């Protein structure tokens, strides 16, 4: 593969230079700070999926004043057909100057739930 100047581009050099190509960090534990509902100024692009067992998952993105590198993706679940929902968990918050947006949930035919997003 070659870059614009016909210079060979390897996977390694691409990963070193483009923050968006680095895998997102997994986050566990309780949410605090900017992730807490009272500190979120907006949220958008919800996606919903249902598992074989009936559990609903919804995800959406938020963070910062609008679209930008402060964006992250949150995930909630419901076991009563959406009457009540869990507190959100942080699913995606890329490091560096990378925006996470447009999340999409999908339940595969084998029952696994996938979360896709753009960054």
List PLM regions with ranges.
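Asp-box/BNR beta-propeller blade signature and adjacent active/binding-site loops
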Residues: 3-119
